[in-house]
């Protein structure tokens, strides 16, 4: 096996630098356990400071939390790819992100058998490292205009205990804004494997989940679960 991009050979010829996955070692013959095609590291460092507080009075149980998170990311390529000879080997440089979030919830325990829980949260977080590069297997280029993603979420659940039966129903609604997503496909026009990166992706996820547990004995129980949900894009993305 020769370490070249077979998709590009027909258009550029087997001796072109363009088809080489590792220009510094052209037409290298691959043996068992060799690294070929691509070789890179994604270095991600995170630091997180988190605080949570709980308070109870009567039937009310309150909880609140907040966090601050710092993230750095870097791609370090170990091969000089023929499709990006100047931008594939070595360090990409470092991208830095500062984010955080908060959550708030309340549980109302009416009695030993009935509990209602409400919660909401917001998170501002760094994008996924793999999606932050234009073509992570080949290039060190960051996606232009990278920014933090924003996640809003809310949920409500009701728990019921009746004898040996415990039932819980949960509804959730999540808004995801400013996401970065990536798809890969073969591009016939350019005769090569291509990455399509989309920024400013906005989505919404919502649904209902239910579970029932019937405790026959202390060692035997039956469980039933069901869920219905939907996930959809809410507007046009940038690509």
Map each language-model feature to its residues:
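Residues on the lipid-exposed face of transmembrane beta-strands in outer-membrane beta-barrel proteins
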Residues: 49-55, 68, 104-108, 156-160, ...
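Repeated loop/turn-to-beta-strand initiation elements of outer-membrane beta-barrel proteins
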Residues: 59-62, 113-116, 164-167, 219-222
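Gram-negative outer-membrane beta-barrel transporters
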Residues: 173-175, 193-239
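Residues that define the transmembrane beta-barrel architecture of outer-membrane proteins
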Residues: 43-47, 96-100, 150-154, 161-163, ...
């Amino acid at each position: 096996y020769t370490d070249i991009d077979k998709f590009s050979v027909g258009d550029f010829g087997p001796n072109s630098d363009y088809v080489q996955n590792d220009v510094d070692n052209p037409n290298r013959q691959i043996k068992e356990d060799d690294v070929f095609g691509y070789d890179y590291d994604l270095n991600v460092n995170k630091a997180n400071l988190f605080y949570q507080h709980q308070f109870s009075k009567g039937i009310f149980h309150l909880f609140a939390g907040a966090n601050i998170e710092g993230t750095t990311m870097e791609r370090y390529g170990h091969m000089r790819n023929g499709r990006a000879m100047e931008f594939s080997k070595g360090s990409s440089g470092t991208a830095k992100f500062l984010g955080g979030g908060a959550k708030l919830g309340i549980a109302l325990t009416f009695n030993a058998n009935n509990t209602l829980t409400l919660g909401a949260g917001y998170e501002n977080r760094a994008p996924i490292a793999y999606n932050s590069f234009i073509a992570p297997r080949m290039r060190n280029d960051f996606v232009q205009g990278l920014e933090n993603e924003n996640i809003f979420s809310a949920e409500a659940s009701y728990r019921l205990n009746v004898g040996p039966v415990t039932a819980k129903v949960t509804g959730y609604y999540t808004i995801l804004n400013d996401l970065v997503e990536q798809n890969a496909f073969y591009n016939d026009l350019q005769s090569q494997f291509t990455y399509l990166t989309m920024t400013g992706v906005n989505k919404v996820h919502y649904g209902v989940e239910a579970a029932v547990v019937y405790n026959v004995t202390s060692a035997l129980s039956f469980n039933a679960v069901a869920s219905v949900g939907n996930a959809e894009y809410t507007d046009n993305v940038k690509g």
